[in-house]
């Protein structure tokens, strides 16, 4: 009884589920070894044998799946495609031989790509665009060759230039960083006007022939009519070169001097010219009652011109911008005797 229980225990231990089933099934009979515990195997055990336990159905492993089942892989476990090579040489080598262009290739022809044409046939893109933009800046031979060559795929073909005289060069920039003013035709009466307004007398002659000589800043200019202006100068003590009976009105540090400027010329530019805020050297005559003025002029003035005010005529007066050179010549004329 004891031996039979011992053999039954060995049989139960040998057929327990902890042992690998595949190993028990696949191992051949000649490779089986006796149990290390000294228990003989089930085949060698005499007497009744125990029935093998029923095993639960197991899922087939991924390695044991038939090759036919791999035709429909799981899309979620699909392997990502291999990364594309960025080298142009490998892509070009893997391309298929050239055939008739498809619709997508014909549509892609409208894109500008530097690989469409070899670099040896045409100049670089910048030189080609500059040549198309300014055809007059290059020689005629190059202009004709560039216009007849293959046009850029993204630009319309330039029209052929009509044979004729070369177009005018682009305007040049002067040193003042601006465009040079256009040369306009001189007006027919511009030269006589400039000649009539320019005084032929120098500072010394004008000083001797005038009745007053001052330099001052133009305060205001009142235009009463065509060729009739009332000018107010602010003169300091150093600017009174020659006074005689010139009427002065004190105004703080300066003296106010009123003058009537008459322009007998029919020019667009007033003569003499006075700009408010500018400093001028003025030499002319003094108005008094003995000097008769036209009745129409007196009606326009309406008492604004008083005796002692200056009287400037375009032909017998001296009006020029102030500078140190002219002032020095007038200072020298003060100490000389007029003939």
Curated annotation (Swiss-Prot):
Residues 1-17 form the signal peptide. It comes from the Eukaryota. InterPro entries: Netrin_domain, TIMP-like_OB-fold. One of its GO terms (cellular component) is collagen-containing extracellular matrix. PROSITE patterns: NTR. Residues 17-191 are annotated as: Disordered. Residues 21-36, 112-125 have a biased composition (Basic and acidic residues). The keyword Signal applies. Disulfide bonds join 193-267, 197-271, 208-338. Residues 56-72, 132-163 have a biased composition (Low complexity). Belongs to the UPF0450 family. This is UPF0450 protein C17orf58. It comes from Homo sapiens (Human). The gene is C17orf58.
């Amino acid at each position: 009884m004891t031996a039979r229980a011992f053999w039954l225990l060995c049989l139960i231990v040998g057929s327990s589920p902890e042992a690998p089933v595949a190993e028990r099934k696949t191992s051949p009979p000649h490779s089986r070894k006796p149990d290390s515990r000294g228990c003989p195997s089930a085949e060698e055990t005499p007497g009744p044998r125990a029935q093998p336990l029923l095993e639960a159905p197991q899922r087939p492993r991924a390695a044991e799946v038939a090759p036919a089942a791999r035709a429909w892989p799981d899309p979620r476990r699909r392997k990502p495609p291999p990364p594309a090579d960025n080298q142009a040489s490998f892509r070009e080598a893997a391309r298929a031989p050239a055939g008739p262009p498809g619709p997508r290739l014909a549509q892609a022809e409208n894109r500008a790509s530097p690989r469409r044409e070899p670099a040896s046939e045409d100049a670089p893109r910048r030189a080609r665009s500059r040549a198309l933009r300014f055809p007059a800046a290059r020689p005629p031979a190059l202009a004709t060759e560039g216009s007849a060559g293959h046009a850029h795929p993204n630009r319309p073909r330039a029209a052929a230039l009509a044979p004729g005289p070369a177009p005018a060069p682009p305007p040049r920039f002067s040193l003042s960083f601006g465009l040079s003013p256009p040369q306009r035709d001189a007006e027919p009466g511009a030269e006589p006007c400039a000649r009539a307004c320019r005084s032929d007398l120098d500072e010394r002659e004008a000083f001797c022939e005038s009745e007053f000589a001052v330099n001052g800043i133009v305060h205001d200019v009142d235009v009463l009519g065509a060729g009739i202006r009332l000018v107010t100068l602010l003169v300091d003590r150093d600017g009174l070169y020659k006074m005689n009976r010139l009427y002065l009105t004190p105004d703080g540090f300066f003296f106010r001097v009123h003058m009537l400027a008459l322009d007998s010329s029919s020019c667009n530019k007033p003569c003499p010219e006075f700009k408010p805020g500018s400093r001028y050297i003025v030499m002319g005559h003094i108005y008094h009652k003995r000097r008769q003025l036209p009745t129409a002029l007196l009606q326009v003035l309406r008492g604004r011109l008083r005796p002692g005010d200056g009287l400037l005529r375009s032909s017998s007066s001296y009006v020029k911008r102030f500078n140190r050179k002219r002032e020095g010549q007038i200072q020298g004329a003060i100490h000389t005797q007029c003939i």
